[in-house]
């Protein structure tokens, strides 16, 4: 019999009389023996079909496996359960009593005030229900549901603002309710478990669109594929043709991934008294002489304002703001509208400990890509087939990358 072990130093022919290749085989007492079987890595299961696995070890020794399925995004920590870290696409507040139950069924119709953007099969978490609806308990409603249909059963034209879920208990009466503080947090659109080859018959729900028209194939109605990498201890995941998401390992497996545009790009302590308010206005001007690098529409969180300025309280200034205009000449500054009551005088202040924390934003950061990778040496996150700066359409030939060691900084700079 051939000697135990594999001999691959030469070609298959030069290894004649030895074992050259094997699969799931070990050598025991000089003889080849197949493995005895498989054991489950984790006792629990995940939802959907896994299309991407990525494992890594943190500096602290934690062993993780990232799992991207056609339905969700998970992370597993050293044989523990799979933690659902699927990003939230949007969170909407419902109008008063917009949850409708029908006697004898577990199907509940929920209406949003604006378009929800969901597709059949998506997951949504309902919170804030303060009373039973048709006999369905509060705890049964305040949980994560899978959307089974869009629209109202009696009006299929309401697909953009209504959706249906199946609760774990049936209603004992027909009623509408929920209260005035109900929110619906929609996870990112789910994808298909199969490849769609064309845009013809059967690619959209029954009755969708006009007769004979084709249906566009996007990330929600095509085979769901992921690319997953680790950025140091953290994980970055990209839905093919979709957004790029970031999961921060330091916050734990109970926190979901967020869009790359929502991570912190820069946090800086500003010079003394950087905040100016104008009499009879809610517009504030904040000086960041170090150069903010922001554009209109970006968000910044201000903290550390020590007292009221021009009649506007510190609590109204120490908030997240949306930038309304920018001035890039020195000293650089930006403005934001904080709403509420106007300032009673023009004044400058804030103290010496004001901090501005900028999010990466959607202008420079890619919001759609085909794939992401990372350069191991300089640690650039590289987006392949992504949107251009300031745009939304995917350019299959465009390759962009972030600054070294800075996954939230994508602004191209001259060197």
Positions of PLM-derived features:
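N-terminal beta-propeller domains
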Residues: 1-91, 189-214, 359-415
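Predominantly extracellular/luminal cell-surface or secreted proteins
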Residues: 75-78, 125-129, 166-170, 247, ...
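Short, hydrophobic/proline-enriched secondary-structure or compact coil segments at domain edges
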Residues: 65-67, 164-167, 234-237, 335-337, ...
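Active-site-adjacent structural elements in enzyme catalytic domains
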Residues: 230-231, 240, 251-252, 261-264, ...
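Short acidic-glycine loop/turn motifs at beta-strand connectors
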Residues: 69, 77-79, 239-241, 249-251
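Generic hydrophobic, aliphatic-rich segments that mediate packing or membrane embedding
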Residues: 49, 69-71, 143, 231, ...
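Small/polar beta-strand repeat architecture
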Residues: 3-10, 84-225, 251-368
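Elongated alpha-helical scaffolds
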Residues: 68, 221-223, 227-244
């Amino acid at each position: 019999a051939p000697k135990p072990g594999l001999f691959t130093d030469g070609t298959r022919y030069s290894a004649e009389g030895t074992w050259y290749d094997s699969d799931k085989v070990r050598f025991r007492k000089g003889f080849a023996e197949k493995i005895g079987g498989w054991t489950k890595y984790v006792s629990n299961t995940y939802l959907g079909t896994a299309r991407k696995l990525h494992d890594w070890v943190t500096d602290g020794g934690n062993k993780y496996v990232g799992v991207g399925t056609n339905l969700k995004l998970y992370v597993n920590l050293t044989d523990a359960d799979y933690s659902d870290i699927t990003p939230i696409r949007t969170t909407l507040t419902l109008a008063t009593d917009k949850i409708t139950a029908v006697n004898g069924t577990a199907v509940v119709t929920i209406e949003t005030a604006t378009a929800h953007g969901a597709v059949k099969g998506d997951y949504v978490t309902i919170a804030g229900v303060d009373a039973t609806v048709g006999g369905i308990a509060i705890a049964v409603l305040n949980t994560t549901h899978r959307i089974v249909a869009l629209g109202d059963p009696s009006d299929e034209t309401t697909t953009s603002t209504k959706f249906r879920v199946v609760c774990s208990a049936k209603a004992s009466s027909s009623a509408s309710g929920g209260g005035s503080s109900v929110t619906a947090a929609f996870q990112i659109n789910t994808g298909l478990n199969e490849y769609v080859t064309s845009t013809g018959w059967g690619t959209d729900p029954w009755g969708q669109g006009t007769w004979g028209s084709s249906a566009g194939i996007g990330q929600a109605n095509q085979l769901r594929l992921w690319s997953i990498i680790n950025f140091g201890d953290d994980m970055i995941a990209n839905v093919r043709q979709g957004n790029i998401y970031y999961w921060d390992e330091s916050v734990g497996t109970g926190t979901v991934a967020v869009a790359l545009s929502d991570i912190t790009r820069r946090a800086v302590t500003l010079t003394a008294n950087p905040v100016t308010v104008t009499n009879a206005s809610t517009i504030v001007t904040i000086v960041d002489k170090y150069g903010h690098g922001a554009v209109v529409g970006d968000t910044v969180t201000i903290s550390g304002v020590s007292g009221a300025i021009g009649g506007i309280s510190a609590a109204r200034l120490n908030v997240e703001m949306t930038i309304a205009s920018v001035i890039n000449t020195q000293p650089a500054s930006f403005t934001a509208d904080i709403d509420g009551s106007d300032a009673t005088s023009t004044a400058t202040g804030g103290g010496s400990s004001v901090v501005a924390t900028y999010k990466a934003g959607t202008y420079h950061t890619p919001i759609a890509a085909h794939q992401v990778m990372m350069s191991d040496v300089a640690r650039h996150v590289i987006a392949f087939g992504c949107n251009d700066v300031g745009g939304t359409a995917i350019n299959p030939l465009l390759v962009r990358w972030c600054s070294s060691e800075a996954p939230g900084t994508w602004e191209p700079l001259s060197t």
